[in-house]
Amino acid sequence: RAGRARELGLRTLAPGDETDVLYYMGCAAAFDERTGRSARAFVELARAAGIDLAVLADETCCGEQARRLGHEYMFQEMARQNIDNLGAVRYRRIVTQCPHCYNTMKHEYAQLGTHLEVMHYSEFLTSIRDRLPSAARARQAGGDRVTYHDSCYLGRYNQIYDEPRRLLESSGLRLTEMRRSRAGAMCCGGGGGQMWQETPPDQRINNARLEDAVAVDATVVATACPYCLQMIDDAIRSTDRSDRVKVLDIA
């Protein structure tokens, strides 16, 4: 995590330090190279808008996957460590790019008595989109046919449907909705700890979800969740469709 923070040129917060926006990277942005590139895109957009952004010097995992896999004690230990670390610094809001971290910190830490002001980065970027560089707000769609995949933790759990779509549309992209979208969207198959389970090819949820995108002739599947990004990318590779469709983070 410290290495990713240095790579992104992010200021780290020691106890007593202060920032406007505390960026909670999460494990995917810290350790996965592709999500790390999405993190860089977000950080560059925030900087271009003049946002004071910093990370915890001792950020740890939010604990969500431990709880989903039944390790409640481990989850609570991780949560308490994060809560203590967050309580030692000053900030106006927390922003994270992972819906799993977002839901955990916003709702499940509240079960432990800690109520945090947390935003998903799609919400945050939407709130400052008028301050973003014109180039970021007016990309050309080219010949791509773009569809947006709703993450379970953004959509059904937190009703964040419009913000990611507004960001894409403000970038000059025209969206084509899949048959199952918004509240009726299909899971990518990575939630509930299933990211770490091996599933027979004919039973893979991510393959079925990819078929929804292929059915509307999408050439790009956009998403705002690192789990969904990985699961849909795996489906593209396992079904040999890399020459027909790709998956990209909205940043």
Predicted region positions:
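Iron-sulfur cluster-binding electron-transfer modules in prokaryotic oxidoreductases
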Residues: 1-251
